[in-house]
């Protein structure tokens, strides 16, 4: 009987939670088809996802208002940095929401930190997507790239790098060569400033002895991880 009561309490709690979320989403909770819901757990979980998406959309809109240049920058760099190979491709996001979706899909920090938005807005570094050409819409690796094609970071699920990234390195070097041929003098000037800022940041991280606290890299110095990740262009 105790187990039955606990089960009933859980069902009632889930139902109340479901109705609360439905109300927040503007769904008429007085409608019988709503309050006498079938497949309660499934519908509850669907509303959780809808509410999460709406909150992220609102957050993306607020971020886009704060960093108004990002959408235009993404449009302007698209012809220069996008590249399609037989196995891999580089995709330029359309703006803030694309980048946030990427970060959510891969469960890493891109899209959750102002420093990435600031770097894009100042054209110090861009966020690009490494994708498999056959699965062009599926998040694979996220890249942070300086204006000359130097790759600062390459991260997949949970900020990791897996062995499969080694297979993509030849393509990334090929992409860097292609990009170097597309660069303007303005791009090269931006890249020089970007390099100076990167080196200054690395030196500050060394002095502060900043360590990673979570994940597979916990305990390592952040600067050592970033230096190891760096893939400078040969151009």
Residue ranges and their predicted role:
Residues 1-235:
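Glycine-focused motif/segment detector
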């Amino acid at each position: 009987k105790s187990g039955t009561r606990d089960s009933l309490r859980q069902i009632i709690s889930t139902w109340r939670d479901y109705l609360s979320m439905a109300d927040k989403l503007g769904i008429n909770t007085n409608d019988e088809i709503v309050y006498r819901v079938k497949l309660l757990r499934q519908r509850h979980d669907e509303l959780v996802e809808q509410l999460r998406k709406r909150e992220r959309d609102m957050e993306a809109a607020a971020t886009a208002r704060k960093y108004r240049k990002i959408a235009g920058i993404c449009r302007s760099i698209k012809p220069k940095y996008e590249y399609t190979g037989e196995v891999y491709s580089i995709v330029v996001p359309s703006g803030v929401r694309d980048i946030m979706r990427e970060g959510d899909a891969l469960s890493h920090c891109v899209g959750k930190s102002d420093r990435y938005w600031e770097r894009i807005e100042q054209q110090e570094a861009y966020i690009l997507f490494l994708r498999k050409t056959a699965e062009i819409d599926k998040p694979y690796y996220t890249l942070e790239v300086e204006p000359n094609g130097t790759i600062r970071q390459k991260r997949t699920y949970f900020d990791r790098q897996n062995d499969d990234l080694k297979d993509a390195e030849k393509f990334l070097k090929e992409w860097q060569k292609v990009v170097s041929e597309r660069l303007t003098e303005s791009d090269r000037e931006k890249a020089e400033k970007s390099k100076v800022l990167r080196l200054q940041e690395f030196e500050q991280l060394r002095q502060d002895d900043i360590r990673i606290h979570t994940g597979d890299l916990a305990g390592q110095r952040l600067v050592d991880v970033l230096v190891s990740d760096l893939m400078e262009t040969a151009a």
